[in-house]
Design a protein with these regions (language model features):
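Acyl activation and transfer enzymes in specialized metabolism, enriched
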Residues: 93, 99, 123-147, 214-231, ...
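His-Asp-centered acyl/peptidyl-transfer active-site segments
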Residues: 85, 107-116, 133, 144-146, ...
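Extended, hydrophobic beta-loop-alpha segments that form or line the acyl/peptidyl-thioester binding
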Residues: 143, 147, 224-233, 346-353, ...
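Flexible, non-catalytic linker and terminal segments flanking ANL/adenylate-forming cores
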Residues: 64-103, 162, 288, 398, ...
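Active-site-proximal acidic secondary-structure segment that organizes catalysis
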Residues: 202-249, 483-498
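Short amphipathic alpha-helices and their capping loops
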Residues: 67, 74-111, 133-178, 197, ...
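Acyl/amide activation-and-transfer machinery of modular secondary-metabolite enzymes
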Residues: 100-123, 155-175, 195-200, 209-211, ...
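A short, small/polar-residue-rich loop/turn motif at beta-strand boundaries
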Residues: 88, 125-141, 157-196, 226, ...
Length: 514
């Protein structure tokens, strides 16, 4: 405003020189009105400035409160990502203590890692081999955990360190097609986790085919299962953007909060409740024929039931929250195990894999149970209070998100166990032009070599508006078909029992029902 006032003065001087001198009285009269006019203008401006200041202050306070009430994700996306990437760089330079569940898993396997491996077959004419190798390297370097090493300190704690200077070897070997079936036993080996690579990649080239063998340290705490890996490998081959992996940042944040009471209580829960020397697998049939026990291939007995009533009840109690469907499935397994043991196993255990990633009811596969996360419940006197039972399992589940965070930032939906069991669609037709042949996958032989048995019971739940299916897979090595049939019959009854008494606070005598 000051600059405009000066311009006005200059304009007045021009007017005077143009029309000649005026009388002193006229000048004084003019100056009087001029000063009055200027005073009014200045006063108006000051009032306007004051009004704007007060209004902006009120608005700023309102925006501050609104900003504080919003999550960090509502900030400027570019700046937020930049800050997260900077923190991730710091995390990658740190030696970090791994989650209690991962420590449990490593120690329980006697320091031998149970891995899930795959060997796939692709026609050479359907793939650019050099491009495939470049995509493989890009995928590896996109996931820091694949370039990391584990270390055990004197205090017994296990740490992980990012070591890009020690990349995994990618072996390329020429081979004859007829020799592929004989590779299986040679490829299987025990991973000694400390100061050694956590992955094994080999490309076998015959005259007509490329055989790709990939074996990756597999545990639900690191987010790098073979299913995620193959999806990212496919994206890299197609020159698509790969999701950022914030595994180390999540682990860094966990380490930063280790001294807080919240984390202390969670860590102590693991130490107090999970016996590293205990085998949490359910009891097996003792009279399985030796030829089945010693068979090296994975054989499954598949059982399934569908129920419209179950679908309605699940939606009634859990709505659109898939995590609560896992609670139901866990309750069902624990209760069925207790009854299956003729009420002798009062502390049955379910091992929960939490394999569904970012899924919703709409993606159909809302629950998968496998072997990693032991959930224990104590039954006694052949009775159960369903309401108390639910609240306890829910409480145990609430601990899980504090320790295990899915590291990738994307919206794709994964159901790892289904992909593994069905063994279909390992790469899209866009990847290689034609369907690939899966030679073999996941074998119990590696469990035997590492002195560790996968829980031979896998469960899945599918639900949508048209159908609900509850499926179980029993390992034929440890269950006779008659035993699997009995277990499934019990599960059908227990699922109905849980749903019918979900909000009933009373003891139910199980002996009278089973």
């Amino acid at each position: 405003m000051e600059e405009e006032f000066v311009s006005g003065q200059k304009y007045d001087e021009i007017e005077i020189s143009k029309y000649g001198k005026k009388s002193n009285k006229a000048k004084e009269e003019k100056n009087k009105y001029k000063q009055a006019f200027i005073s009014i203008i200045i006063s108006s401006i000051l009032i306007l400035i004051l009004f704007i200041f007060i209004h902006s202050k009120i608005k700023t306070n309102h925006l501050t409160e609104e900003f504080q009430s919003k999550s960090q994700s509502k900030l400027n996306e570019k700046d937020a990502i930049s800050d997260k990437d900077k923190l991730n760089e710091i995390a990658l330079k740190s030696k970090l203590r791994i989650y209690p569940l991962a420590q449990y898993f490593l120690k329980r396997t006697n320091y031998a890692l149970l891995n899930i491996f795959n060997l796939i077959k692709i026609k050479k004419e359907d793939i650019d081999i050099n491009r495939f190798i470049l995509a493989l390297n890009k995928t590896i370097y996109n996931h820091p955990v694949l370039l990391s090493r584990f270390y055990e300190e004197d205090d017994g704690e296990i740490y992980i360190e990012y070591r890009p200077d020690l990349p995994p070897e990618i072996k390329i070997i020429k081979i004859k097609d007829e020799d592929i079936p004989n590779l299986k036993d040679n490829l299987l080996h025990i991973y000694k986790p400390f100061n050694s690579s956590l992955v094994n990649f080999t490309i076998f080239l015959s005259d007509d085919y490329l055989y790709f063998f990939y074996d990756i340290f597999h545990s639900n705490f690191d987010g790098n299962s073979v299913i995620i890996f193959k999806n990212n490998l496919e994206a890299a081959y197609l020159n698509k953007t790969l999701p950022k992996d914030y595994f180390f940042l999540n682990l860094y944040n966990y380490n930063q909060n280790l001294k807080s009471e919240k984390y202390k209580s969670t860590v102590n829960f693991y130490k107090e409740n999970f016996d590293l020397t205990r085998d949490y697998c359910p009891k097996f049939d003792e009279d399985i024929p030796e030829n089945i026990k010693n068979n090296k291939s994975l054989q499954l007995i598949y059982k399934e039931y569908s129920s419209e009533e179950l679908r309605q009840q699940l939606r009634k109690y859990f709505g659109e929250k898939p995590k609560y469907y896992n609670i139901f499935m866990t309750m069902n397994i624990l209760l069925a195990n207790y009854i299956y043991s003729d009420f002798k196993d009062e502390n049955p255990t379910a091992k929960i894999g939490f394999n569904g990633r970012n899924w919703t009811i709409d993606s159909n596969s809302v629950g998968c149970l496998i072997y990693n996360y032991p959930v224990i419940y104590h039954f006694e006197n052949k009775v159960v209070n369903i309401k108390t039972f639910y609240n306890k399992i829910k409480e145990l589940f609430e601990l899980k998100p504090k320790l295990m965070k899915y590291p990738f930032e994307h919206t794709e939906r994964y159901s790892s166990m289904m992909s593994i069991i069905q063994t279909k669609g390992f790469f899209s037709s866009e990847f290689a032009g034609k369907k690939l042949e899966l030679i073999y996958f996941y074998d119990n032989l590696i469990n035997m070599k590492s002195n560790y048995l996968m829980t031979p019971l896998m469960e899945e739940l599918f639900i949508d508006d048209n159908i609900t299916k509850y499926s179980s897979f029993f390992d034929a090595k440890f269950y006779k078909k008659s035993s699997a049939d009995r277990f499934m019959d019990i599960q059908i009854k227990t699922s109905k029992l849980i749903m019918e008494n979900f909000d009933v606070d009373k003891d139910i005598n199980l002996e009278n029902l089973f």
